[in-house]
Amino acid sequence: MLNILVLGNGAREHVLVTKLAQSPTVGKIYVAPGNGGTATMDPSRVINWDITPDVANFARLQSMAVEHKINLVVPGPELPLVNGITSVFHSVGIPVFGPSVKAAQLEASKAFSKRFMSKHNIPTASYDVFTNPEEAISFLQAHTDKAFVIKADGIAAGKGVIIPSSIDESVQAIKDIMVTKQFGEEAGKQVVIEQFLEGDEISLLTIVDGYSHFNLPVAQDHKRIFDGDKGLNTGGMGAYAPAPVATPSLLKTIDSQIVKPTIDGMRRDGMPFVGVLFTGMILVKDSKTNQLVPEVLEYNVRFGDPETQAVLSLLDDQTDLAQVFLAAAEHRLDSVNIGIDDTRSAVTVVVAAGGYPESYAKGDKITLDTDKLPPHTQIFQAGTKYDSATDSLLTNGGRVLSVTSTAQDLRTAVDTVYEAVKCVHFQNSYYRKDIAYRAFQNSESSKVAITYADSGVSVDNGNNLVQTIKEMVRSTRRPGADSDIGGFGGLFDLAQAGFRQNEDTLLVGATDGVGTKLIIAQETGIHNTVGIDLVAMNVNDLVVQGAEPLFFLDYFATGALDIQVASDFVSGVANGCIQSGCALVGGETSEMPGMYPPGHYDTNGTAVGAVLRQDILPKINEMAAGDVLLGLASSGVHSNGFSLVRKIIQHVALPWDAPCPWDESKTLGEGILEPTKIYVKQLLPSIRQRLLLGLAHITGGGLVENIPRAIPDHLQARVDMSTWEVPRVFKWFGQAGNVPHDDILRTFNMGVGMVLIVKRENVKAVCDSLTEEGEIIWELGSLQERPKDAPGCVIENGTKLY
C-alpha cells in the first residue's frame, strides 16, 4: 500500500487528497499542513501535519516521511519545488511527483522561461530582458507607441505581472520592481518586458514523466475579483473545463508546437521535467488566416488553482491518480491508464472572504448544507481551519472554498454549481456570478429564428418604463416646459421662464456623471439616491456660473433593462429636478446586451440653464484681497472620491449592510449613498441681487483645487479649517484608510459643498438670505495677494483632523 505525503493547504491540495484517497492502492495520506477540509476527512486514512513546507522545515519533513514510510510525495504549491524539495526526498529514496529545482526554473524565472521558449521555437510574445532599471526605462520611453507587459523575474507571490496603461505607469512599474524591490529582492534583479497580446486565455495541465505526457482537458480561469473581469487580480475566482474554444485542431497545434517541444527541450537541456506542467496560453487571431494561434504566456510547474478542481473532476472512474503520479515520478507514465469522461463538463466557483484580495476577516464560522448539495457536486476547502474544541469549521484565508459541479453539458454544470453555492454560509462571503461566461459568448450561433428580444433588448420593457415614469417626469413641470416624455426631444420657452427677448440672455450647459458611486448603488440595491446625485453634479455646476437651471436630460445605459431599477433611478432624477427647479424634459434609456455585466448600469446627465450677461459668475475683475470666503455645508461625501471610498471599505472588510460607523441609524450603504446636496434655490436670490463675486462647487480635488478655479491668478484663498466641524464621515475614512492629510484634502469636500466669494459689506445680507433657506454657513477665510509660485489655496489647521 502507498503512503503519500501531500504538501500544501489549499483547495488544490484538498481535491488532490480526495482523488488520491479514492485509490485502492493507497494506505495513508499525510498533508502538510492541510486545512479544515483534510482535517475532517476519514482520520484513519488522512492525517494533517502542522508543518508548513518552508525551507526551514525540509529536514523535518524528510525525517517524518522516512518515519512514516512515505512512498510518494506530491507537492502542491510552487515554492517548495523552486526551493529544491524534490532533491530532499530523492536523497532518501522517496519518489516525488514534481520537477527538480533546475526544471522548476520554468516558473521561478520568467527570463529563463522566455529564453527557453526562444531557444526551442515555442510561440510566445516578443520580449527583452533587462538587469538595469535605467536601460529598461529608456527602452520603454523609446517605444511609447507600443503596449507592453512588465514582469518581475521571480515568483513575486503571484503579483509580479503588470499591464501598464501609460508610459508613466510603465516607468513606475520598473521602479517598483527593480529599485524599491516591492516584489522581493530576487524578483527585482531582472525584468522581462514583453509584447502585450489580446485574446482568450486558456490553461492546460499536462502530466509529464520527463519523456511522455498526457494532456488533461483545457480550462479557462477567471482572475479578476468582480463579474465581467473587473477589479483587482486574484489567485482565481473560478474555472471551467473543457473550454469550448479549444477545438480538436487547436489542441493538436498546442500539443505539437508547445507541449511536446517544451518537454523535449527541457530533457535535451539536461533538466527533464517530471510532474504537472501548467501552460498558460493566449489565443491570438492570425491576421492572414483568421485562425486562432496559441502563444505561451507563462509556465507553472504545479497544478493551478482553481483549474485543478474542475479538471480532476473529469477523470473517469478507471483512473487511479495515485498510480498515475507514481508512474510519472518513476518515468513510466505509459504503463498506466489515464482516462477522461468526455461526456461531462465541470465548473468551479470560488467563494471568498469579503475584502479579498486585500484585507479580510478570519475566524468566521462556516456552515455547509451538504445534505442539500445537488448531485455530482463537491466542496473543496482552501482558506479554512477546523476547531476541534467547538467542532466548528472557520474561515482562515481569502479564497475560502471551491464549489465544483459536473454535468452532461456546460450550461447545466453552471446552473448546478450556482445552486450548490447557496449551500455555503459564512459572514461576508463573496463569489463571482458569471463563471464560464466566455464559453457562452464563444458558442456557435443557434439556427433558430432570433428576435430583437432574443438579442437581449426588450422594446416592451422600454415602453413599460416610459409609462412607469411619466408621472415622475410630469412632477418636474415649470414655466417654459411641459415635461412630457415619449417624443423625440424636449422644448423650452425662455419667455415663459421669465427671460425676455430684449434682455442679454446666455444659455449655459453642463454635463456630468456620478462615477464609481454607481458601483455601490448596484451592490446595495439602492438606486434612487444616485439619480439625485446626477442632477446635483450638473445643476451645481450651472449655478456657480450664475445660471438658473431650466431643463435636464438623463442617459441610462444597461445590459438588460430592469424596470424597477430604472424607475427608482428616474425617481431620484425627478426629485433632483424638483429640488433645483428645472424640468426633466427627456432622456435616453439604452439597453445594450453584452456591454455591461448583469445588474450593472451607467448614467450621464446634461443640464441647460440661462443667465443674464451682467449676472455671469465669477466676477474675477471685481475680486480683491480681503474678500470673504463663506462655506455651505455638504450632505456628506457627495459624488467624488468614491474610488478611494471603495478602496477603504475593501480594506476594512465591512459589508454594505453593516451599521454605518458615522451614523448608527443607517447601514453603511445608506450612509455612503447620501445624495449630493443641491445649492440652486438658496443661492439664486443672492445671485439676482448681485451680492456674490463667485462660487466654487467643491467636487473632485477638494477645497484646495476647486476654489482657485473661481478666483484670479493673482489672489490666493486662505481657508481655516478650525472655523467648522469636519463631519465624522471624513474623519472615519481618514482613520480607517490611514489616508495622508494632503490626500484627503485633495479628494473630499471635508463638509463644505459650496464656497461663496463675497465682499465684506455684503456678508450679512448673503448670510441672512441663506439662513432663511435653512442653510448652515461658515466664514472660512478670505482672499489675499498670492505670493509668487504659491498655490491658489492654502489650508490652515488641516493636519490634526484625525
From Swiss-Prot:
EC number assigned by the record: 6.3.4.13, 6.3.3.1
Entry-linked InterPro entries: ATP-grasp, ATP_grasp_subdomain_1, PreATP-grasp_dom_sf, PRibGlycinamid_synth_ATP-grasp, PRibGlycinamide_synth, PRibGlycinamide_synth_C-dom, PRibGlycinamide_synth_C_sf, PRibGlycinamide_synth_CS
Positions contributing to Mg(2+) binding: 298, 300
Presence of keyword Cytoplasm: yes
Binding note for cofactor: Binds two magnesium or manganese ions per subunit.
Domain ATP-grasp: 114-330
Annotated stretches, region: AIRS: 451-802
Pathway(s) served: Purine metabolism; IMP biosynthesis via de novo pathway; 5-amino-1-(5-phospho-D-ribosyl)imidazole from N(2)-formyl-N(1)-(5-phospho-D-ribosyl)glycinamide: step 2/2; Purine metabolism; IMP biosynthesis via de novo pathway; N(1)-(5-phospho-D-ribosyl)glycinamide from 5-phospho-alpha-D-ribose 1-diphosphate: step 2/2
Main localization of the protein described in the UniProt heading: cytoplasm
Gene3D superfamilies: 3.40.50.20, ATP-grasp fold, A domain, ATP-grasp fold, B domain, Phosphoribosylglycinamide synthetase, C-terminal domain, PurM-like C-terminal domain, PurM-like, N-terminal domain
Catalytic activity line of the entry: 5-phospho-beta-D-ribosylamine + glycine + ATP = N(1)-(5-phospho-beta-D-ribosyl)glycinamide + ADP + phosphate + H(+); 2-formamido-N(1)-(5-O-phospho-beta-D-ribosyl)acetamidine + ATP = 5-amino-1-(5-phospho-beta-D-ribosyl)imidazole + ADP + phosphate + H(+)
Domain of life: Eukaryota
Residues with Phosphoserine modification: 455, 458
A cellular component term, taken from the record's GO annotations: cytosol
Region of interest called GARS, as start-end residue ranges on this chain: 1-450
The keyword Manganese is annotated on this UniProt entry: yes
Keywords annotated in UniProt: ATP-binding, Cytoplasm, Ligase, Magnesium, Manganese, Metal-binding, Multifunctional enzyme, Nucleotide-binding, Phosphoprotein, Purine biosynthesis
Membrane-spanning segments: none
Single GO MF annotation: phosphoribosylformylglycinamidine cyclo-ligase activity
Chain sites annotated for binding ATP: 141-203
Function: Catalyzes the second and fifth step in the 'de novo' purine biosynthesis pathway; contains phosphoribosylamine--glycine ligase (GARS) and phosphoribosylformylglycinamidine cyclo-ligase (AIRS) activities.
Note: Present with 35800 molecules/cell in log phase SD medium.
Family the UniProt entry places it in: In the N-terminal section; belongs to the GARS family.
Name of protein: Bifunctional purine biosynthetic protein ADE5,7
Organism for this UniProt entry: Saccharomyces cerevisiae (strain ATCC 204508 / S288c) (Baker's yeast)
